[in-house]
Each structure stands twice: as structure tokens, then as C-alpha cells.
A protein has these predicted regions:
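Beta-propeller blade termini and top-face loops
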Residues: 1-628
Length: 628
């Protein structure tokens, strides 16, 4: 394999750590790209976690008493729809050159690791636990023997995990922890509950008490913690309150009483995606809250503003400081790593970390070398050549950013490499003319009096193999265009279950409307997720949905035949139809890849039909769990 993607985009960073004894050595973790290490302040990098079984990372920590000891918690701690999951915690004793799995395999999402300042064998791990299902391993875990054994010291609820912990630098027996109750389903997201809150231990985590004086009694959401390095009696908490509102709370008496300083809270797609809180080691009272734009306060959160971020990617998740430079910040975003030497007035982008998260890719048929296209998480849609006959090879300048926002599915027109289709989230379909540079919005719109179109977060695009200008697109119904998207005709009714998603169970039961729903963090539900057409028979169409349905039409959409995936032996009724493909050689054969991990089921579901969907068989064979 050779890497072929762009050099102008990186990807989502989950954590950053600077070596305490050598500030040229950094460790960077990615939401979907493993762990990377540099020994020259970002000039070059090497991946140090690629041989392990998880690519999604939540947190990294170095032992203060022996920085060669490195701990990595897998599965990033955000509540988003596109979050990767992990398989526990890992330890290295040689600076990341080799790793050993140390347990917590069913944690899925690890948020914070704290190592005792004087004893590398004592470690506390904040485990948020599964996002999509109950149970698993969640809570605060402690080891006193370097990870050989773990003791759960906080948390006993099937939906409540621990999202952050901080330690008093004067007394390692004093710890503060934030619990978080959350659950996401394919249909909805609830980002808070009565299990969320603040807790304190004065005996190294063996016993805990809830901190409630001054904290609102409503259903809290995600909480970020920080402790003042200059005066550790001062503890800060960025708290998500009802319906994604929030506030910055401060205690000046070691957590006994709390005062709301302001309404400071992260926003954008929702606090579930940010809320990491940092206290400056250089300026007393200065705190940073990760957000779409980094929020900074110089008076303990009473007043605040956005850090200057000109020529820098938004969506900030991680921050690191140098011990001897108060104006230096190293920050991780959805677009990679940046550093500033003047507190945000100017930024340097480290463009050499290949971490871009591609949703889907496509190729055209241009000669002599075809081009590649890919839609990415928060880095737009990219175009670049597969090869070149130039002596200098493929350059960064050969890659183009052809569409904005989150890029998703892409498609090309056979025989005409100038026409490309791309989309932004939830069906923002565009046609790109590579020759003229024109970008045209062509999303199908409902007719007057019709309800809105429910487009999936990653809606499917299909160019017909029988007519290059014919385009299919899907919301909850299938649309067809004969003129590259200039006009559209619906060729189906609603092919999904069309449910009222707020009435569906979440956290194990039906919830009232006044609970901690985060509507803005929910994707559309009851949507079409995949489209296919037989290359051997025009109008033989296949549709898959996010609610466990396959639909087949043999007459170009005039009639549809419904298959419940739960009727297929060995397939759960809830399975998400992620991709459906008609066979290239046999007109009667079709394949589908299904996913049920959003119900806590990591089994592979690959199915095949040899009679146009009338009957199916499971063909997953010995494919391993967590891979399809």
C-alpha cells in the first residue's frame, strides 16, 4: 500500500501530551487514527500503535515519575454519531515502542488517565463506557500494581460512566471526578441524567462523596474538570445543564461549595462533542474550554471570549502547554494539530499527520490516470490523482478541496470525468463541474404541502450504470434525475418504518419530553442509507435503511418489495443496512453489509441473495467481530 491522500488536511485529534523532560517529544492521539509520536516538535512523526487492535483513541498519559511508561485508553470520549470505539487500556514501558493490553476490554470509551506522581504503578482510569448500549465496563477504575488488577471505585449504574478526573498536585489522595449519564441510539440522543455529577475522594479513590452544594439539581450532561496549579483549593467544572445550556462553576474550598461564574459552555454540535477544560500553568485564573472556537477566561470563568483562531481549523478537543513559555499552546482539532507562540495571534499548522477520516471514496475513468474523490469528517470533499508521469511525483498542489463542511458520499459520471457529485451532511447534494469549477446545489426538495425530506447523515448517491446522466438519491424515499440533478422525480413512497423517534426507548425506557434530549445532536432517522442498481438489468433497484429494511424494485421504482432483515436467519431486526451491491456478473445476485454495533452487537453481518432478494443467507463465515 502507498498513501495517496491529500497533504493539506489532517483529522480529529483526541488528546495531546508533551514529554515532561523533553518538550520536543509529543504524543498525539486521534479519534480514528491511533497514536503518533514526534521527537522533533512535529517535523516528523511515526505511528506507534498501528499493530494494536484499536484505532480509536480517547486518552494518553505519561507517568510523571518515569515518562517512559505510557498509558493509552482506547475509544474517544465524545457522544457523536461518528465516534469510534475501543477495546480497553494499553501500557508501554519503553516510550511507546511496544505495548501490552492491560484490560478493561469492554470499556469502549476511555476518557481520562491519571498516574500517581510518585508511583507509576498507581493509576486511575475514567471509563465512560459504551455509548450505544448499557453495561460494559464503566466508572472509575484504579490499579495499584501497574494494571495487573483493577478495582472499580466509583460508579454502579448501567448508563453512567466517568468522563473526567483531576488530582490535587499537593496531595495525590485527593481526586475529583465527573460522572456522565448518556445514551445514543440510531434514532435519538439523550446527553444527561440524574447520574451525572461531581464527586470527591480524599483517600486515593477508595471512597467518594457527591459534591452538590451550589450545583444545579437538574439532569446534568457532560462535565469537564480542571484544578488550579497555582492554588489547588480552586477547582473548576464546565457543566452541561438542561438542553445543552450550561455554565462554568468554581469552588475555592476544595469542592465543598460551588459558585456559577458564567453561562460558559461549549456549543456547536453540542457539549457532548467538547467540554475539555484546562487551567493554565502560567496564569492564575486563566482557563480554556474546548469548543468550536476555544473559549478562554482570565478571571476564573466570570468573563470569557474566543481565543484568536485566524487561519486555523475549528472544533477543538485537546490542549497542551510548555512549562517555560506562557504564550505557547499546542492544540488538537477536527483538522489536526496547530501550535501558537503568541497565544493565538498566529498559528502554525502541522500538515504532516495523515489522519483524515474518509466516509466514502470514488474514482473516475479519466485517462491516462484516474482520479480519486473522498468525503471526510469536517474536512470537506477532496480530489486527487491516482498517479502521474511527472518526475517529481504527485504533489500536494495536485490535490483539491472541492466541497466544504463534512464530506460524505461521492460519485462520478462514467465517460465524463468532468462531472462529480459530492454532498455535505444530511443530504446536501452538489454537482461539481471540474472543467468550469462550478458547484451547483441539486438536493431534491419536497413539493408544496409535503413533509420535509429525511436525509441520512451520510445519504447515498448512485449514478446509473445504464445511463451516465441518470442519478438516484435517497431520503426516506428514492429520487431519480435524468439530467444530472437539474430536476427530480420521486419514484417511491416512504420505504422506512416512519416512526416517532422520541417515543422509542432510550436508556431502557420511553422518556418524557422534558428529559435531557439533545435534539441538535440527533441525525435524521428512518432514512435510506444505501442504494444499488444491477449493471445487468436497468431498473433493478435495491434500497437499504437505517431501521432494518431492504426494499427491491424490478421495474425502476414503480413497485417495491419489502424485506425485514430480522426475517433473515441469524440477522437481528435492528441491523442497519450499511451497503448494498448488485452482483457484476449474475443479474439475480445481490449482497448487503449490515451493522448492529449501535445496539451493542459487534458481530459481522454479510448477507447474500441469489434470487433478487426473495431469500437471503448469512455468509459472514469466520469474519471477526468489530471488523465489518
Amino acid at each position: 500500500w502507498r498513501g495517496v491522500s491529500t497533504g493539506f488536511a489532517s483529522g480529529r485529534i483526541s488528546d495531546i501530551t508533551i514529554h515532561p523532560e523533553n518538550e520536543h517529544v509529543w504524543f498525539v492521539t486521534a479519534g480514528s487514527g491511533g497514536v503518533w509520536k514526534t521527537e522533533n516538535a512535529g517535523v516528523t512523526w511515526r505511528p506507534i500503535f498501528d499493530n494494536q487492535s484499536s484505532y480509536s483513541i480517547g486518552n494518553i498519559a505519561l507517568a510523571p515519575s518515569n515518562p517512559s511508561v505510557v498509558w493509552v485508553g482506547t475509544g474517544e470520549d465524545v457522544g457523536g454519531r461518528h465516534v469510534g470505539f475501543g477495546d480497553g487500556i494499553y501500557k508501554s514501558t519503553d516510550g511507546g515502542d511496544s505495548w501490552k493490553h492491560m484490560g478493561l476490554k469492554n470499556s469502549e470509551h476511555i476518557s481520562t488517565i491519571i498516574i500517581h506522581p510518585d508511583n507509576e504503578n498507581i493509576v486511575w482510569v475514567a471509563v465512560q463506557g459504551p455509548l450505544w448500549s448499557k453495561g460494559g465496563e464503566r466508572g472509575l477504575y484504579k490499579t495499584t500494581d501497574g494494571g495487573e488488577n483493577w478495582n472499580k471505585v466509583l460508579g454502579d449504574d448501567e448508563w453512567v460512566g466517568v468522563t473526567d478526573i483531576v488530582i490535587d498536585p499537593r496531595n495525590p489522595d485527593v481526586l475529583y471526578a465527573a460522572t456522565w449519564q448518556r445514551h445514543r441510539t440510531v434514532a435519538a440522543y439523550m446527553g444527561g441524567g440524574p447520574g451525572s455529577g461531581l464527586h470527591k475522594s480524599t483517600d486515593g479513590g477508595e471512597n467518594w462523596k457527591a459534591l452538590k452544594n451550589g450545583i444545579p439539581s437538574s439532569n446534568l450532561g457532560k462535565i469537564g474538570l480542571a484544578i488550579s496549579p497555582q492554588n489547588p483549593d480552586i477547582v473548576y467544572a464546565a457543566i452541561e445543564l438542561d438542553r445543552t445550556k450550561g455554565g462554568l462553576f468554581m469552588s475555592d474550598d476544595q469542592g465543598e461549595r460551588w459558585t456559577k461564574m458564567s453561562d460558559m459552555v461549549s456549543g456547536g454540535t453540542g457539549p457532548h462533542y467538547y467540554q475539555e477544560l484546562y487551567a493554565s500553568p502560567h496564569h492564575f485564573g486563566r482557563i480554556y474550554l474546548m469548543n468550536v472556537r476555544t473559549i478562554v477566561s482570565d478571571d476564573h470563568g466570570k468573563t470569557y471570549s474566543n481565543l484568536p483562531e485566524r487561519n486555523k481549523h475549528s472544533d477543538n478537543h485537546a490542549l497542551a502547554f510548555r512549562s517555560n513559555d506562557p504564550d505557547y499552546l499546542l492544540i488538537g482539532t477536527d483538522g489536526g494539530v496547530y501550535e501558537t507562540f503568541d497565544h493565538g495571534n498566529n498559528w502554525r499548522y502541522l500538515d504532516n499527520l495523515p489522519l483524515t477520516q474518509y466516509y466514502k471514496i470514488a474514482v473516475d475513468d479519466e485517462l491516462p490516470f484516474y482520479n480519486l474523490y473522498g468525503g471526510t469528517q469536517d474536512n470537506g470533499t477532496h480530489e486527487g490523482p491516482s498517479a502521474t508521469d511527472l518526475s517529481e511525483g504527485i504533489r500536494n498542489a495536485d490535490w483539491k478541496h472541492i466541497l466544504f463542511a463534512d464530506g460524505h458520499d461521492t460519485a462520478t459520471e462514467p465517460g465524463n470525468a468532468n462531472i462529480v457529485y459530492g454532498e455535505t451532511q444530511e443530504g446536501g447534494l452538489h454537482r461539481i463541474d471540474r472543467k468550469t469549477g462550478t458547484v451547483t446545489f441539486i438536493q431534491p426538495q419536497p413539493l408544496e404541502g409535503e413533509d420535509y425530506e429525511r436525509y441520512n447523515w451520510d445519504a447515498p448517491i448512485l449514478v446509473s450504470p445504464h445511463k451516465p446522466t441518470r442519478l438516484y438519491f435517497a431520503s426516506h424515499r428514492v429520487w431519480k434525475s435524468e439530467d444530472r440533478g437539474d430536476s427530480w422525480t420521486p419514484i417511491s413512497g416512504d420505504l422506512t418504518r416512519d416512526q416517532e423517534r422520541i417515543s422509542l426507548p432510550i436508556m431502557g425506557r420511553t422518556q418524557s419530553w422534558d428529559n435531557a434530549w439533545d435534539v441538535n445532536a440527533m441525525s435524521n432517522y428512518n432514512t435510506i442509507t444505501s442504494l444499488g442498481e444491477s449493471p445487468l438489468q436497468e431498473g433493478l433497484l435495491y434500497v437499504g435503511t437505517d431501521d432494518g429494511i431492504i426494499q427491491v424494485s424490478e421495474d425502476g421504482g414503480a413497485n417495491w418489495r419489502k424485506i425485514e432483515v430480522g426475517s433473515i436467519k441469524g440477522v437481528p431486526a435492528t441491523a442497519f443496512v450499511n451497503d448494498i451491491r448488485a452482483d457484476l456478473h449474475d443479474v439475480n445476485t445481490v449482497y448487503a453489509a449490515l451493522d448492529n454495533h449501535k445496539y451493542g452487537d459487534f458481530s459481522p453481518y454479510l448477507i447474500k441473495s441469489s434470487n433478487r432478494g426473495k431469500s437471503w443467507q448469512l455468509i459472514s463465515g469466520d469474519l471477526p467481530e468489530r471488523h465489518l
